[in-house]
Amino acid sequence: MKLTDAICVFTTSISTNMCSITAILNDQGTPEEMRSNALQISKLQRHRGPDWSGVYQNDSAVLVHERLAIVDVTSGSQPLIDPEHQTALAVNGEIYNHKNIRKSTANYPYQTGSDCEVILALYREKGAELVNDLEGMFAFVLFDPRDQSWIIARDSIGIIPLY
C-alpha cells in the first residue's frame, strides 16, 4: 500500500502482558525527526516490553518494538529483518502455527527461533496474502524498503488492538 500522508501505527491494551509496536511511515520529516517522534510514542509503551527495545529506520519508515519475550527468549529481538531483501517486521502477538509454516518455508534463511519470523518467509512467497496462512493473535507492521511499501495487519478477531 502507498499513501502520500504520514501514517503512525501502534498497538495498545489495558493488559501489560504483551509487546508494543510503533511505526511511522511515509513521513515527510527528516529521519532524525521521524526517529525522535517514534521513540517518544514508544516510550509511553515501554513498560509493556521489558525484555527488549529495538528500532529499525530508513529514510521513510521507523519501526519500534518493545518486547515481552514468550517464544525464543534469547534471539527473537525485533524488529526482524529479512537478511536478503531487508524487509523489516515488528510484531505484537503469537503465531500459533509457526512450526508448520517454518516447515513449509524451509528455503527461507531463518535467523532466529521466533514464531513471528515466519511472517517474513511467507511475505517472500505470498506478499500481502500471507495473512491468510497465519493462525494466532497478532498485529504487525511490515515495511519493504525495495519499493517503500508496507503491510499493516492484525488477526481477524482483533485480539491485539491496532490503531
What are the residue ranges of the model-derived segments?
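N-terminus-centric sequence/structural signature that marks the extreme N-terminus
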Residues: 15-163
